[in-house]
Amino acid sequence: MSAGKKHARDGEDQGARLVKKAKTADTQTDSDPAALKTDKKKKDKKDKKERKEKKEKKSKKEDAEEDSEELQNGDSAAVDSEPKPEKEKKEKNNKKDKKDKKDKKDKLKSSGAPTTNGIAQDGEANAATTTPNGSAQRNGAAYSYQQTKTLDAIPEDEIKEFLAKQEIAIADPLGANLRPIIHFSHLPTSTLTSKKPFASFTAPTPIQAASWPFALSGRDVIGIAETGSGKTMAFAVPCIESLASSPKPNHAKGDRTAYARAVVVSPTRELAMQTHAAMSSLASLVGLSVVCLYGGAPKDDQRALLRKNSGADIIVATPGRLKDFLSEGCVSLSDVMFAVLDEADRMLDKGFEEDIKLILGSCRPREKRQTLMFTATWPTSVRGLAEGFMIDPVKATIGNRTRAGEEGEGNGSTELQANIRIEQKVEVVDPRGKEQRLLELLKEAQKGSAKNDRILVFCLYKKEAVRVEQNLERRGIRVCSIHGDLRQDQRTRSLESFKAGTTSVLVATDVAARGLDIPEVKLVINVTFPLTIEDYVHRIGRTGRAGKKGKAITLFTEHDKSHSGS
């Protein structure tokens, strides 16, 4: 081979090798495992960083939502004290506002009230804007109390004049400005009011006018008014309206327990029976049942009555009998959404305090029930205990003994005072001539056209009442009696005979002094001075009722000094 050819061949080989080397280098760059591994690491690192950033962002978002929920629910747990970025704070506030709006909308929806743009609308032509109610959904009832247009249209000066004339003082810790219901037409339209249950009455009594707006709004109410002022209807109307607008809870078939949705507790059998009669007439108009439970009557008969009605919507009871049925398990108050203590000062007196705690403790918690207390007096000694059963109660006080709002206190406190329409007289007599003087007073009071006037004679002890009754019978006085030693049927007959006018004189111990509706009592005579000033006020409060005048005479002897404060 010539040198030229060899040189050319070497050049071709070198060129081929360079091309091959270049191709090999390209191939190594694309397929070399080490290079691929390096690229993957870089990519993984980048992906990991992005995931971490997303996770941190999500965590911050969740923290912000949790903080917003804590603010919304009032949670007392500690939250991050470090300042948040402005954007995050704004985001939290927006979420809170949205949640508030949703909650309000849900509440309106659950109440059954039609809404327009989230604002409750009343379909009645006579309805005005919704008024404050404080706790409308607390016990599960669909409260939608609204002042009527006719009530709204009354000038404020006339409202103030009405309150002053009727001596009404209202103290509301929540400051809801609800006007008194001056006329029955001012009551919201409902199934009950459409039946015209008040057709025979001219206007609500002051305690009804003052308490109804708040009670119909779902608020707890303390009503303080003299006896004979219409307190029974003051709590009966909102109780029945509340139950009529709420669904009945379901219970297992075959459950023999009697469940109630409302309970009214009264201190005496007579008052319980009287309240039962008044509430039954209203409840029947809307298909609700009322059962009365009291001592002195067979338990089996009352159990049978409960079974017959599959329980009762409303139970009116004395504390002792209700406590017995609760302990036996035949009555349950776990569904009670409306509780009433009638004659509350006596109910919370020393002997009833534990019973009341047991009864109210068997009901729904106070946050989930409505509690009303009505009474003629409100002694300082029981105010604190009574308010422990309630939430932000409104105090409606009737009479010139009120001091609600005085000097900016707004505490609704009252001074104990007898009915100012009652003429009071005290006669100091010799103990041995007391019953003879009683006979003289009765004959003087029942002269001529007043011979059938009703006179109520109070004794301190049962034995004294029996002796006085027998003595008057021997002297030809038409008399009957009511005291603790009599059977329930005997007490009922005596009370009905006195109300009907068959007998014109009723001899009683203090058991008859509280809350009984005995119309047209012209005179009250205290043969023996009562043990407390509260009992004295309630005794003489049997006369001078419903705006009428009355008279009370107390026979006072040296033996009465020890318990009269003399």
UniProtKB/Swiss-Prot annotation:
PROSITE patterns, per the entry: DEAD_ATP_HELICASE, HELICASE_ATP_BIND_1, HELICASE_CTER
SUPFAM superfamilies (UniProt xref): P-loop containing nucleoside triphosphate hydrolases
Organism lineage string: Eukaryota, Fungi, Dikarya, Ascomycota, Pezizomycotina
Catalytic activity: ATP + H2O = ADP + phosphate + H(+)
Residue sites binding ATP per the record: 225-232
Annotated spans, Disordered: 1-139
Listed EC numbers: 3.6.4.13
Chain positions of motif Q motif: 182-209
Protein name, UniProt field: ATP-dependent RNA helicase DBP3
Span of domain Helicase ATP-binding: 212-396
Gene this chain is encoded by: DBP3
Chain intervals with Basic and acidic residues compositional bias: 81-91
CDD domains: DEADc (cd00268), SF2_C_DEAD (cd18787)
Organism expressing this protein natively: Chaetomium globosum (strain ATCC 6205 / CBS 148.51 / DSM 1962 / NBRC 6347 / NRRL 1970) (Soil fungus)
Main localization, broad class: nucleus
Free-text domain note: The Q motif is unique to and characteristic of the DEAD box family of RNA helicases and controls ATP binding and hydrolysis.
